[in-house]
Amino acid sequence: MAGRLRVALVAGEASGDILGSGLMQALRARHPEIEFIGVGGPRMEAEGLSSYFPMERLSVMGLVEVLGRLPELLRRRKRLIRTLIDARPDVMIGIDAPDFTLGVEHRLRQAGLRTVHYVSPSVWAWRQKRVLKIREACDLMLALFPFEARFYEEHGVPVRFVGHPLANTIPLQADRVAARERLGLPLDGQVVALMPGSRGGEVGKLGELFLDTAQRLLGERPGLRFVLPCASAARREQIERMLQGREPLPLTLLDGASHEALAACDAVLIASGTATLEALLYKRPMVVAYRVAGLTYRILKRLVKSPYISLPNLLAGRLLVPELIQDAATPRALATTLSPLLDDGSQQVEFFDAIHRALRQDASAQAAEAVLQLVERR
């Protein structure tokens, strides 16, 4: 492809900044004469993006917070659309953050520009009618998972399965001994990772439950040890408060280091979320648990169309890992379900290995190829 390319990218959160920077590297490797404009974080800026405003202005979580910032978000989106239409990039790529980026993509596509969306929203699980908006908004969807690609194909949306970047980052075989040495854990004996989530609300719902489960497991298996990676200082303080007044537990709290914890452990008790994909890629047998407010659960039960909540089961297309939700998630049930996996989790591990290899596609390279092919079809 000859000539200079102008590529617009819009990311709204840290995970999108990581994906965006990898995509920018892969695009430049294939087409050195390239200019990047749009909105991104420090990683994308380090790759040469001229960001129109700080990405953090789009990073809003929670309904109340979104409502409080809605006038600013709408104003920024309107200005961004106008700026990008004037700039006439060869292609615009929205990275995740669908509530913001899909609106931008839709307006740019109406103005005759090529648009791509990188990372599918969970339309296959709930609010499936959003696929109609996606079909109008983008020329191409870049999907991280094969079941997402199948969903879009069924709904007439051009899609390319590119794999997941973590599948290339995480080795096919993690070194458990080296991880334990780095964490100062004994090399013999079994270790269970407790991962109750990264947000305060999740830890509030699951932290005590996971600690109670650990106490039960310890009663059955006196030599067991536990590690719990804390996503932030606030989460560590939250867990430390929960530990006060409890019977002593052979538990190591870690600052971050969730990947080290997964590499070091023999099995995982884990909140439903993206961390379950990381546990799968580390080939660690797991039990998934989740609790939300009662009203939220009743609403989600009506809206969610998927039979599973965890990525390992969605990727396997069957109930591969146990999911204990709401009232079913009790210390006794979790301990009873997890304990056999410490003796033999090979069935899960075999599937995890096959899934890891399927996702190991070099996502950034695949995404870059798909974007450039779209541009060539002008």
Swiss-Prot record:
Pathway: Bacterial outer membrane biogenesis; LPS lipid A biosynthesis. GO terms for molecular function: lipid-A-disaccharide synthase activity; phospholipid binding. InterPro entries: Glyco_trans_19. GO terms for cellular component: membrane. One of its GO terms (biological process) is lipid A biosynthetic process. It holds the Pfam family LpxB. Keywords: Glycosyltransferase, Lipid A biosynthesis, Lipid biosynthesis, Lipid metabolism, Transferase. It comes from the Bacteria. Its EC number is 2.4.1.182. It catalyses: a lipid X + a UDP-2-N,3-O-bis[(3R)-3-hydroxyacyl]-alpha-D-glucosamine = a lipid A disaccharide + UDP + H(+). Condensation of UDP-2,3-diacylglucosamine and 2,3-diacylglucosamine-1-phosphate to form lipid A disaccharide, a precursor of lipid A, a phosphorylated glycolipid that anchors the lipopolysaccharide to the outer membrane of the cell. PANTHER family: LIPID-A-DISACCHARIDE SYNTHASE, LIPID-A-DISACCHARIDE SYNTHASE, MITOCHONDRIAL-RELATED. Belongs to the LpxB family. This is Lipid-A-disaccharide synthase. It comes from Pseudomonas paraeruginosa (strain DSM 24068 / PA7).
